[in-house]
Amino acid sequence: MSVEELKDTVHKLHERIQQLEKKVGVLPSSQPDFAKQLRLVLIGAPGSGKGTQSTDLKDKFCACHLATGDMLRSQVKQGTPLGLEAKKIMDQGGLVNDEIMIGMIKQELETNQDCKKGFILDGFPRTIPQAEKLDSMLKDRKTPLENAIELKIDDELLVDRITGRLVHPASGRSYHKIFSPPKKEMTDDITGEPLVQRSDDNEAALKKRLVTYHAQTEPIVEYYKKTGIWQGIDASQKPAKVWKDILKCLGQ
């Protein structure tokens, strides 16, 4: 068989494979399979374990972790159009509006390669209008939310957790001085970079944040219960058990 005949045979085989893929509904590898994406909102009070579980979810599902606070700081630092608009509002003491936040999430979904296999939203939405605008944007992209998982834990337990929390700023990995210490004191296990304790990780600041959190979150939980995608998990358990429960919620 000549080289040209071999090429022709390979070409015909490739065409035949594509025909068979279409018959059984297999998408070409160049197209994202939206049906298999992780599309999740993670709900939880400060210290409930969202950061820890988001990192594990990101690694397991090769999805992107969209922490809106981090996104906002990144956009401002990079000087993007949305970041500049947000900075102008913040410099005047205002709150960044929903349109800018939705725009940042949409931009991240469209440009971040890690988001091709799904996303974990952390810290957003916080109000019913935000949830409605998020749903509208995601439905327009044909990537509606599949799950809203709430990490439930008593406020009293959160105080012990949060006051000993240590964070690796670049990745969001979190540790605890007592319950989950790093291998080397004040040092990230993966990168060897220093850990920090956030200035607002103290009891007085936490109690103020919890009042705001509960006022905002209860309506959001009810919203997602009505849509049928909400599930609650006991976050007072050990992280490994919480992780197993999350996987059960995701059908794993």
From Swiss-Prot:
GO biological process, one term: ATP metabolic process
Location(s), subcellular: Cytoplasm, Cytosol; Mitochondrion intermembrane space
Region of interest called LID, as start-end residue ranges on this chain: 164-201
Reaction(s) catalysed (UniProt annotation): AMP + ATP = 2 ADP
Subunit structure: Monomer.
One of the record's GO cellular component terms: mitochondrial intermembrane space
Listed GO MF terms: adenylate kinase activity; AMP binding; ATP binding; DNA replication origin binding
Keyword terms, alphabetized: ATP-binding, Cytoplasm, Kinase, Mitochondrion, Nucleotide-binding, Transferase
List of residues binding AMP: 68, 73, 94-96, 123-126, 130, 198, 209
Entry binding sites for ATP: 47-52, 165, 174-175, 237
Coiled coil regions in record: none
Family: Belongs to the adenylate kinase family. AK2 subfamily.
Segments for region (NMP): 67-96
Enzyme class of the recorded protein, top EC level: transferase
Domain notes: Consists of three domains, a large central CORE domain and two small peripheral domains, NMPbind and LID, which undergo movements during catalysis. The LID domain closes over the site of phosphoryl transfer upon ATP binding. Assembling and dissambling the active center during each catalytic cycle provides an effective means to prevent ATP hydrolysis.
Protein known as: Adenylate kinase
E.C. number: 2.7.4.3
Chain's role: Catalyzes the reversible transfer of the terminal phosphate group between ATP and AMP. Plays an important role in cellular energy homeostasis and in adenine nucleotide metabolism. Adenylate kinase activity is critical for regulation of the phosphate utilization and the AMP de novo biosynthesis pathways.
PANTHER family on file: NUCLEOTIDE KINASE
Taxonomic source organism: Lodderomyces elongisporus (strain ATCC 11503 / CBS 2605 / JCM 1781 / NBRC 1676 / NRRL YB-4239) (Yeast)
